[in-house]
Amino acid sequence: MADLLQEIREEYQLYTYDQLQYKKKVNSISDMFGLKQKNRFKTDYCAAYVIGRFQFAPIVMFGLNPGYSMRNSPIEENEANKSWQNYQNFYLNFFRYFSHNKFESPYYTALWYLLSGLTGTNFPKKRKWELFDQYLCNIELIPYHSEGIMLPDILNKEQFEYLQERYISNINFIRQFKPKLLIFNGKVWKTLLINRDLIEQHIEAPNAKQFRMYFFELDGIPSVLFDRFFQRHFLGITNDDRMFTIPKLIHDRFENLSHDLEKR
């Protein structure tokens, strides 16, 4: 556990005490991936690695990187950069903070449908932050904010090694808390885990939509990978798909998952 938490603390200290070096580091990562304009990582926001109560969350969502909202992000930043203790408390209780401030997010609205279907809970949409606080932890592959993001389909050696190191650090951290389901969201995960053979075996789910799902296990933990961002409506994914079709495919594959989520 100490490795990732130490990495997060060192990153926070760099951001707090040496802004110039922090900006150079973040810019170098943007340069590594050839990112331009709004896709470049923001150098004036502290990194966000783990969001939610990771010790207890049964569902872990692995994303690409934290996004950016003109309304929400400056408020988040003001809270996170007050102190190291405040940073930890803020991201641990992130969903409660969003609930208290009545924040809205298209991503989390789409995620409410998916988690409602997976957990079989009856949290209404207006109480989605309570659902996330009880069930969800987000872990970012790249911890820096950006307005958009587009990574190469084929990774060079430097890009692959950076992403592999971050993936291993995240997995080694979260596996000790024994979550019940891991979800990998986005094309980069197919590029990294499947195309680069970081997982030994996987099964492609039957699916008529314009994206693919892959099932596998990591240390016995049920895992699912979406090769596109599941929250994007233009891919032909509907809210009914998120609440019913996709959860059914996952539960059909991992028959004990419903029971495991109920036991939390």
Task: Locate each region found by the language model.
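C-terminal capping/extension of enzyme domains
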Residues: 1-29, 154-171, 189-264
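A polyanion-binding, active-site-adjacent surface
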Residues: 2-177
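A short helix->loop->beta-strand "cap" motif at the edges of active sites that frequently abuts
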Residues: 57, 178-180, 218-222
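Structural motif
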Residues: 61, 181-183, 225
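Short, solvent-exposed loop/turn segments at secondary-structure junctions
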Residues: 65-69, 142-146, 187-191, 229-234
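Internal, well-ordered interaction modules that form the hydrophobic cores of assembly/scaffold domains
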Residues: 174-193
